[in-house]
Amino acid sequence: MLIRIPAGGDCHESEVTPEAIYRSRRRFIQGAALAGAAVGVPLLARAAEQYPGVPASPAPPWFVGKLGDARWRAVVAQGEAITPYADATQYNNFYEFGPNKGDPARYAAELKVEPWTVLVDGEVEKPGRYSLDDLFTEGQLEERIYRLRCVEAWSMVIPWLGFPLADLVQMVRPLSAAKFVRFETAYRPDEMRGTRSSFALIDWPYVEGLRMDEAMHPLSLLAVGMYGRVLPNQNGAPLRLVVPWKYGFKSIKSIVRISFVREQPRTTWQSMAPEEYGFYANVNPQVSHPRWSQARERRLPGSLFSPNVRDTLLFNGYADQVADLYASMDLTKDY
């Protein structure tokens, strides 16, 4: 589905990125009709023109094949500068690799992401173990530039590549009894050193969940790439969820299981500290974390003398698109 964020989130692509990159992208788009005939390295090179300076990385054949008809800039973010690739890939929360922001970039290469399968089960007509090629055979790869707001009060703007979550839901045909979708991260102690730590408080594997209407919302994305490339391991390769109106911990990484369930799943952070992390985790500047305010955020990159602090927007700036999902709820209680 082609989504265009209206006035609250739309802009011309030249407003989101430096002119040199913008012009390079326009040259790419003008030649897109020929891209479908290219395969392998030439096609990756064309995709790389989207973001000059981003290091090349190997990509599986199914991903390369999807680049030919990718829908670039399907969603943009008004007046926002894209976070530099180095910041987006070197400052991460991914506790399976360690508690520090640099641990995922340092250790995530130990995770083997090829081959990769996802178990789909629960209240669904087409359960099974699917490869990523199976899941996205019919889908068109889309680039979506989303704001990412961490519950720790920092934020980024990231150009994701992926497929609408709703497409997968419709493909596997959940039964009417399914009211929620439960997601599970890989648990591989031999490859994820953070899970071997005796100091880790998390009951692995990491679990997240959405209501069915949230999963079906057009903004919900299953990401397989970013910055014109395949997802780096530290950012959740090879498959992660992106729900831009929720705090970042809802956007679960390295997904190996998607279950359609009757009851609201007990999610990881909710289980660990329910008074601090609710199931919904919608970005809300009026509902503070018990230990800090959520009214403002630090947009990365920043520095000691230029911290780049700004006001946080309700639903991370996507209120026009998602507020109706919660019209009957008290957002100060259902957080």
Q: What is each stretch, according to the model?
A:
Residues 25-26, 240:
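Short, cationic motifs built from Arg/Lys/His that form the positively charged side of catalytic pockets
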Residues 27-50:
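N-terminal export signals
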Residues 1, 42-43, 66:
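Acidic/proline-rich low-complexity IDRs
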Residues 4, 8, 36, 45-46, ...:
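Generic detector of low-complexity/intrinsically disordered segments
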Residues 1-24, 49:
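N-terminal secretory signal peptides
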